[in-house]
Amino acid sequence: MTPEDQEETQPLLRPPGGSAPRGRRVFLAAFAAALGPLSFGFALGYSSPAIPSLRRAAPPAPHLDEDAASWFGAIVTLGAAAGGVLGGWLLDRAGRKLSLVLCALPFVAGFAVITAAQNLWMLLGGRLLTGLACGIASLVAPVYISEIAYPEVRGLLGSCVQLMVVTGILLAYLAGWVLEWRWLAVLGCVPPSFMLLLMCFMPETPRFLLSQHKHQEAMAAMQFLWGYAQGWEEPPLGAQHQDFHVAQLRRPGVYKPFIIGISLMAFQQLSGVNAVMFYAETIFEEAKFKDSSLASVVVGVIQVLFTATAALIMDRAGRRLLLTLSGVVMVFSTSAFGTYFKLTEGGPSNSSHVDLPALVSMEAADTNVGLAWLAVGSMCLFIAGFAVGWGPIPWLLMSEIFPLHVKGVATGVCVLTNWFMAFLVTKEFSSLMEVLRPYGAFWLASAFCIFGVLFTLACVPETKGKTLEQITAHFEGR
């Protein structure tokens, strides 16, 4: 066995006597890091209340037309894709802690530019900056938290990444009821500012420090996080932290988690989650909710409640079980969604443009209201199922399955895949509905959910209760 193999497969962080650490400061450090995902969620949710506010804005404030509003929402995903690449580069060179500190800067700068915006280009520039920060935070925060957490709480703390994302989205929706777009952007500066402040007092992850052979700093970090540092092993002296090389993809400990990580990110976006979110307000309108903006808040509350539930049971139920159950729920709910659109579809049209409100707004009011409640139930079931499994777990597994020496590149590729697929699905879903009709598009999403369940059962290992080094050893076949 080579020194590199020893480093990747033996526990770097082994407590004396095999006992589990019980330090409480690890929760403080995880909270500080999770303020990045909270900022990320707020940036994602910002566009929903801000776009109507900008459309109402009187000169000289910038005004959004339909095309500009589309870009105002979508440009975040492009910035985040770039942020994923940059975050992967920073992760191994600047370290986990400094990467989180640095990602706070484009968050604050982006919201500050939006606050001061006098034209469309400033708005888009600010959104691009916040998107860049979203990409970095979505990569670095899960890795930081997974590397400071001991196995007994890694699922709980790792799931808090997605919990903070959906909490940030919900906060943006709620604040949007009382704040105009400029003040909403000011509020967006608060979470990353707190993260910047708190992370200055948090340690670098012990695993990263040990991989750099900074023994004393690693011992100090362990003492801070877990309360003691005696008896923990340093990697063999011959094991040096190495950059990623393409030849390493021949190793099963590298290519297997690569395939799993990329596939999970792709299946997450192909599940139809963005389409369901996009049409939430239309569905609530058809169910006769007078204030359709209530849809956003209801969706946000469901996400928060069920993501919190997932966090609490993650280390007992396990990743595979929750992914499988989540996928099954999503299969049935997207199938029901497609059935709703099939039953409410209007007659033949000469127009090639799919106008969803027209498709679901026919004259048979009583019948349609009943069917709309079917859609509302299906939508809520889908969101609950997604929040329990396919929402948080791909991000959690991404932070667990890669060995240290490829983690920066590998997680960067996974995040890039996720954001690129999000952009592609969001932009092309309307075109897909023109070809397949809305019911066909959602039935296709249901098929992808089935493939996701089968992939989970066939390829995804259980990681609960294992050290990160034991997970790597599993992929290496040792």
From Swiss-Prot:
Source organism, top-level taxon: Eukaryota
InterPro entries noted in UniProt: MFS_dom (IPR020846), MFS_sugar_transport-like (IPR005828), MFS_trans_sf (IPR036259), MFS_Trehalose_Transporter (IPR050549), Sugar/inositol_transpt (IPR003663), Sugar_transporter_CS (IPR005829)
Ranges per topology, Cytoplasmic: 1-25, 92-97, 149-158, 204-257, 315-320, 390-405, 461-478
Extracellular side: 47-70, 119-127, 180-182, 279-293, 342-368, 427-439
Chain intervals with Low complexity compositional bias: 11-20
Predominant localisation class: membrane
Keyword Transport: yes
UniProt keywords, alphabetically: Cell membrane, Cytoplasmic vesicle, Glycoprotein, Membrane, Sugar transport, Transmembrane, Transmembrane helix, Transport
Self-association state and partner proteins as the record states: Interacts with AP2B1.
Protein name stated in the entry: Solute carrier family 2, facilitated glucose transporter member 8
Natural source organism: Bos taurus
Lineage: Eukaryota, Metazoa, Chordata, Craniata, Vertebrata
